[in-house]
A protein has these predicted regions:
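Pyridoxal 5′-phosphate
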Residues: 1-159
């Protein structure tokens, strides 16, 4: 393991024992810090409106998928504790296969797999599906897009 070379004492191969340099090796990513500030500035005035929009879409998606035989929604929470993200599995498909079909045949983008949390899938029972299909909705997601996803999954599960 190699380490050392700080912004305050570049020739010293030991990490500092005191101060912020102990935890912050290298230069701060000022461009990302500035971008984060701008993102907050742009989204903050609409935050409540965006959250309500996401929750409306979430209800539409949850209601639509829950009526399809063989689809299991994971991690359902009370709406007031939810954001525009929903994970599900289908008993006829592994998550990667379903994601690929949705992409190639329906032009719908979802995230599939273990989502950087492989051990959680043992707990939620999605290992046999190769993880989950995760849908993320935001400001620019439309009800039409959510309905298209529901209809695509329904069509695939009825084949």
């Amino acid at each position: 393991l190699y380490y050392g070379g700080t912004g305050s004492d570049s020739r010293n191969l030991s990490l500092p024992e005191k101060g912020s340099s102990r935890f912050e090796v290298g230069s701060p990513d000022t461009a990302s810090i500035a971008a984060l500030g701008k993102a907050i500035e742009l989204t903050q005035p609409r935050a409540e409106e965006d959250l309500l929009h996401e929750r409306k879409l979430l209800v539409k998606l949850r209601d639509g998928l829950s009526n399809i035989e063989g689809v299991r929604i994971l991690g359902e929470q009370p709406l007031e504790n939810s954001v525009g993200i929903l994970s599900f599995v289908c008993d006829r498909y592994r998550s990667e296969e379903l994601g690929m079909i949705l992409d190639e045949d329906f032009d719908i983008a979802v995230r599939t797999g273990y989502h950087c949390a492989p051990l959680v899938h043992d707990l939620i029972g999605s290992v046999e599906y190769g993880g989950t299909v995760r849908v993320s909705m935001g400001r620019f997601t439309t009800e039409t897009e959510v309905q298209a996803l529901v209809e695509a999954v329904k069509e695939l599960m009825e084949e």
